[in-house]
Curated annotation (Swiss-Prot):
Similarity comment text for this entry: Belongs to the NARF family.
Protein's GO biological process: iron-sulfur cluster assembly
GO annotations of cellular component type: cytosol; membrane
Full protein name: Cytosolic Fe-S cluster assembly factor NAR1
Record key words, sorted: 4Fe-4S, Iron, Iron-sulfur, Metal-binding
Residue sites binding [4Fe-4S] cluster 1 per the record: 20, 74, 77, 80
Amino acid sequence: MSAILSADDLNDFISPGVACIKPPAQNSDQKFNSLNENGEVEIQIDSEGNPLEISKIDGKQTNLSPAQISLADCLACSGCITSAEEVLVAQHSHEELIKALNEKVDNNSTKVFVASISHQSRASLATAYNLSIEEIDKLLINLFINQMGFKYIVGTSIGRKLSLINEAQNLIEKKESEFDGPVLSSICPGWVLYAEKTHPYVLPRMSTVKSPQQITGCLLKTLAAHELGVTRNDIYHLSIMPCFDKKLESARPEKYGEQNTSNDVDCVLTAKELVTLLEQHSDKFQLIPPQAHTITNSAIPVVDLYSKCAPRTWPLVQYSWSNDSGSASGGYGYNYLKMYQNHLIMKHPTKYQQEGFSIDYVKGRNTDLTEMRLMYGSEKLASSAIVNGFRNIQNLVRKLKPTVKPGSTTGKGNALVARRRARVAGGITKASSPAGSDESADASKCDYVEIMACPNGCINGGGQINPPEDVSEKDWLSASLEKYNSIPLLDLAAMENVDTVAEIMQWSCLFREEFGVSENRLLKTWFNEVEKPTDSASILLGARW
């Protein structure tokens, strides 16, 4: 191993910052008072431990309020790569959920609780409790509706299908205009934060289509509020997700829709945290209650339960917990290729026949890098890639870094690095493919890249339940993947489901018209290049991670 490369460099996990560099905010009144009334001041602690601001001119004392850092602050800060752990725990924890539930009872408030749960979280829970997907779904519905008092619980399938369809349609439009790829997915908040804070030059390539979590949140809050005759602010939306970074995504401020700027998700818990909640409050809540056998063996079809626990106007309720084809992160890369195939068949029926298409899989240097190529005979028509894990992401963004303009000077070290990379790249190509062939996976040359920060993608998210001591991580992951793949499928990419795709999109348009929700508000996100700190103190604090 090279002297400049240690084992620590191979770890995909990015530790949170131990110190926050964001200064406490002051409103204009506070600033005016401090500067103009008190003049020069000093901070002292009184006998009760409270901070005081004391004027050196007249001795006037002013109580200081505690500084608070929110998740939205973390999104706008470059002090650390990911969020401060304390912020996540404080604002998105099972304790906060229990606190909110108790406040509803104690204060007799009008707050209504609703929940959505991801495919990967269901698979993780089913694996941990050794149950089928249908059994775990029935028990989850019983837990949230009958025990915790939630009004609705839905799967994230409709939100994901809207995300998949819009992603594919946007790519097809770009493809036909001969765009300069690749487009990079943005449904992984860990990857998005990394790009915003460290590689802003890739932001123009990022897809602006929202993730299933956020689309589901907008639909669920809007429909629930309308049916119950309350405001969106009266709806408390809990989302069960496979990844802790989803907490940060839920806090990203809405840029579109002046009338609906409130968060679509109020609390994000992972499957791991849900288990912790159940362990700490086993006297009140049980996923596996004494009558569990009666619940799981009920003669009521699970599809009827999906309908019963969803808002009355929830779309395509029979498919609202269904799965999608492709990877266990949602299948974005695969669905783009298949939908583009369907587009070509419908647009050029005499030129393209379904039986002439195939998808070739080209492996990369490791199992977390795969390229998929849509072929018609021997002709490559489109391509996408799956890039999982921080190391593969780093390699991709290096390749996408803008080249140095002609005439500009570069340091000797940079030139040496460039030559070294070129040698390495050339060696890899020669070793993995015959001379002159195009068999080496290269995500940077694809139309689209499905990017997830976690190795193995969302099914292996940091919030998934850990394996028992006697089970290897590899076997546990395989078991979770098997559960995930057992979720009933509604394959949007299948030619026979083209009408279903049209139905989903038509319903989306009607929803936006009826409730005055713009297309951007429902479906589009945005990115922000985070400026790096320039003062030495902030740089020093931000570097300690």
